[in-house]
Amino acid sequence: MAMLCAMLPAGAWAELELHMTNREQGNHTLTIFEAQEKADESAQKQDDEQSEVSQAAETANVQIETRFAQKKAEQLLSRAGASVQQSGELFTSGNLASMTLVWNGTQADGANGSSTIGLVLDLTTGEAVELARLFDDADAAFAAMENIISDDVLSELSDYMEYGDLLPMPTDNYAIDEQGLTVF
């Protein structure tokens, strides 16, 4: 199990932990992400601070479930003929946590295929971080990335891919890691 932590804002006496667990069941592999409050053994938390931290963990878990359909993936395991193979990555930088899930086999909608799903969370609030928030001038950054796609990527696409899938550049499915930004 991988476990990463990030400090909450000054004044809070707790940390939010993000866990990633890979669980094998028969020939299936599930990746489960979960946020929770880190136990604070050094001091008794005040009620308002406890509530703030618990709310951040709850918000993060709602974002995780909404994005990754973890409960649906578990339900698929009992369906005859379903095959689920997942692998995940977890990365933190400052108060951001980035999760990536590669899902092969039976998808949440029941279709067979492969998908890559990313989610970046603010560990102080548990909220999803929109891609535009990572840039001082999001419009200029997106335009520069779309120029790279137009100039360098489109000519390399195989025939089965649609150009429309890349431009305009999707901004709702991305992840960050030590290499930088990946848009899916």
Predicted regions and their residues:
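Sec-dependent N-terminal signal peptides of Gram-positive bacterial secreted proteins and lipoproteins
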Residues: M1-A14
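Compositionally biased intrinsically disordered regions enriched in Thr/Gly
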Residues: W13-F184
